[in-house]
């Protein structure tokens, strides 16, 4: 059984991004109930503390906050470095998701439990 950690956002993102690197964040109306069309934000590890109030306000409005896992920008065409392979499956119950993750031959680097799914990451090292 994996140990659950409650870690600061900066610590979670550190394996993906170096100091001073641009981190791209996307904010969506997860429940699709309002007129909010979404937002794209950019910061760095050192800039995260200054962005926390903004992120909390979005979260209080039931908006999902996601980071672009790979480095380079918000769009696929802007990605210049693969930081991790990742997957999620909202359609399966959490226990079934965990069974499939545990059956996979490569142990994940990180698993994040969200409201509906397990976000699973395999960190990459560029050679």
Task: Give each language-model segment a name.
Residues 87, 108-127:
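Histidine-centered divalent-metal-coordination microenvironment in nucleic-acid enzymes
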Residues 1-83:
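DNA replication initiation on ssDNA origins
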Residues 61-62, 80-82, 104-107, 114-116:
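Short, well-ordered loop/turn elements at secondary-structure boundaries
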Residues 90-106:
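Short amphipathic alpha-helix segments
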Residues 81-92:
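Acidic di-acidic motifs
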Residues 28, 69-71, 90, 114, ...:
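Structured loops at beta-to-helix junctions and adjacent beta-edge loops in soluble globular domains
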């Amino acid at each position: 059984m994996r140990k659950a950690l409650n870690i600061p956002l900066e610590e979670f993102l550190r394996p993906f991004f170096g100091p001073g690197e641009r981190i791209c964040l996307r904010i969506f109306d997860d429940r699709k109930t309002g007129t909010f069309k979404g937002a794209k934000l950019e910061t760095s590890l050192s800039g995260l503390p200054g962005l926390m109030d903004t992120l909390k306000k979005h979260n209080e409005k039931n908006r999902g906050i996601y980071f672009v896992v790979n480095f380079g920008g918000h769009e696929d065409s802007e990605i210049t470095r693969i930081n991790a392979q990742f997957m999620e499956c909202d359609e399966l119950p959490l226990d079934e998701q965990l069974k499939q993750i545990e059956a996979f031959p490569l142990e994940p680097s990180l698993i994040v439990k969200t409201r509906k799914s397990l976000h699973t990451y395999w960190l990459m090292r560029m050679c």
